[in-house]
């Protein structure tokens, strides 16, 4: 099991290869990354048998930017019939697992395999349980089968608490009909990724205040209002009337890059389409000057050297806070609902909660 298999957004295979190669080098795991363009997946081939396991044990999955999901294991060719027997034979060297996910890559060809996986899962699950390879124990590793076709599958393992929270890393979020734009799903997914669900009532509570920079028509504002927050929406464009009618939104016609609140707020969110360095500077200003406690900001990516640019900006942000003597946590992820962008979440660790509304 010396191969680390990773899912990603189509077109970002090179970024996954660059990122995982950096982490492997830091952990002294020898190997090489490979991928084909627009296949929505990449591999890191370790030269040592335990390399993939050491890499996964030494790296938190939720700290990775571009991979959506990962698993260590091997590829297996399947016959046209009796696939289950072949899979069971190969799994003899695998430990018993506590859960089973059947996955496909995020391409048109991959999506065509979804129905096959749905039909195949029940008999496979039954066979695995009868063989003692699948038990009801969340502490045990997760068995991940990624089907490249009906004749090829990647048999993989991952710790349930150190891998994606959804199959393939794709959230099943429902678009709210009353939301003004589909961008609302980006912020909802960001909260799922960056904030543990059992902390939502504390960190996304109805007695908080927020600012949405570049708010119109209000996709991100909607998520704040949905949590009951009092929101200041900054944009020269019009806001959705449905949001204004809630009485929770104050709309100010102003420049999102120059606006500053009179009093600190709990949340700042921003999805302005601008050069990533300008949006990154907003994070430094708002968190560094204590204007907010937490922030979610999208960084639009350049056409080339995307991982290198994101890494450079994150390093600059971290160095800036260190120079200020400000303690923050920094997270960054290319979410499923992101396109040519990544989403950053920052949280100050040394300021009190803003005054309640």
UniProtKB/Swiss-Prot annotation:
GO terms of molecular function: S-adenosylmethionine-dependent methyltransferase activity
Function: Catalyzes the 2'-O-methylation at nucleotide C2498 in 23S rRNA.
Main location: cytoplasm
Record keywords, A-Z: Cytoplasm, Methyltransferase, rRNA processing, S-adenosyl-L-methionine, Transferase
Residues the entry annotates as binding S-adenosyl-L-methionine: 183, 216-219, 235, 255, 271
Keyword Methyltransferase annotated: yes
Record InterPro entries: RlmM_FDX (IPR040739), RlmM_THUMP-like (IPR048646), RNA_MeTrfase_FtsJ_dom (IPR002877), rRNA_MeTrfase_M (IPR011224), SAM-dependent_MTases_sf (IPR029063)
Enzyme active site: 300 (proton acceptor)
One GO term of the biological process aspect: methylation
EC number: 2.1.1.186
GO cellular component terms listed in the entry, alphabetical order: cytoplasm
Catalytic activity reported: cytidine(2498) in 23S rRNA + S-adenosyl-L-methionine = 2'-O-methylcytidine(2498) in 23S rRNA + S-adenosyl-L-homocysteine + H(+)
Gene3D superfamilies: 3.30.2300.20, 3.30.70.2810, Vaccinia Virus protein VP39
Recorded family membership: Belongs to the class I-like SAM-binding methyltransferase superfamily. RNA methyltransferase RlmE family. RlmM subfamily.
The protein, known as: Ribosomal RNA large subunit methyltransferase M
Location in or out of the cell: Cytoplasm
Subunit and partners: Monomer.
């Amino acid at each position: 099991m010396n191969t680390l298999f990773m899912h990603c957004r189509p077109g970002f295979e090179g970024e996954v290869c660059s990122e995982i190669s950096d982490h492997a080098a830091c952990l002294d795991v020898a190997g090489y990354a490979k991928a084909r363009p627009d296949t929505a997946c990449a591999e890191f081939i370790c030269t040592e048998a335990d390399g993939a396991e050491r890499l996964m044990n030494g790296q938190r999955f939720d700290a990775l930017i571009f991979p959506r999901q990962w698993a260590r294991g091997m590829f297996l060719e399947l016959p046209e019939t009796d696939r289950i027997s072949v899979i069971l034979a190969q799994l003899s060297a695998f430990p018993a697992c506590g859960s089973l996910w059947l996955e496909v890559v995020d391409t048109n060809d991959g999506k065509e395999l979804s129905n096959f996986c749905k039909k195949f899962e029940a008999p496979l699950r039954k066979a695995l349980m009868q063989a003692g390879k699948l038990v009801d124990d969340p502490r045990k590793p997760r068995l991940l089968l990624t089907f490249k076709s009906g004749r090829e599958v990647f048999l993989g393992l991952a710790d349930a608490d150190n891998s994606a929270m959804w199959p393939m890393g794709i959230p099943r979020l429902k678009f709210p009909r009353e939301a003004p734009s589909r961008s609302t799903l980006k912020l909802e997914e960001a909260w799922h990724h960056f904030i543990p669900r059992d902390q939502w009532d504390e960190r996304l509570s109805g007695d908080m205040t927020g600012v949405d920079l570049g708010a119109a028509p209000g996709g991100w504002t909607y998520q704040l209002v949905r949590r009951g927050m009092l929101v200041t929406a900054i944009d020269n464009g019009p806001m959705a009337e449905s949001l204004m009618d809630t009485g929770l939104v104050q709309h100010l016609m102003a420049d999102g890059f120059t606006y500053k609140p009179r009093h600190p707020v709990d949340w700042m969110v921003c999805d302005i389409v601008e050069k990533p360095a300008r949006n990154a500077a907003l994070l430094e200003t708002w968190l560094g000057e204590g204007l907010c406690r937490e922030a979610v900001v999208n960084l639009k990516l350049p056409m080339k050297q995307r991982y290198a640019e994101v890494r450079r900006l994150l390093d600059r942000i971290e160095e800036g806070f260190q120079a200020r003597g400000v303690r923050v946590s920094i997270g960054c992820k290319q979410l499923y609902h992101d396109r040519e962008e990544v989403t950053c979440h920052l949280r100050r660790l040394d300021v009190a909660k803003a005054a309640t509304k």
